[in-house]
């Protein structure tokens, strides 16, 4: 609703890429008031339909970000407009930044050296070193890219908003059962 968008302290970054026979979606969210952050990544079949973006819709409805950065690769403007509506971003976000994968800052967020630097800057040296701290980041490449871009974006706009940010909670879990309208 419009009221929940006005009350949200969340900023999200959605990273979408089409590759081979699938669409990969990496998502990152920061609550700038509490410092909580979360990431999620999903793969879906390569088709442009509302059900393709169900997990994105779940993520958006759970966090209701008032500002969203959407980074796309191999998506047309029309498809981006559609997914903003499919996922409910158009109704909850007051501000949507749309970026293509060719953007310099986006290209930088793809580089592992830069990702480690950002993780170390915001979460301490242990998160920036190779080891257990980076294990989940390594297995969720697009969620990591989304978080890297989002951390830098928020820091550039107001460094105090990410001064005491907590390590991100990975919302990827396999113990959820998904029921769609046609499954009952």
Please give the residue ranges for each predicted region:
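Charged catalytic and DNA/RNA-contacting regions of genome-maintenance
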Residues: 1-184
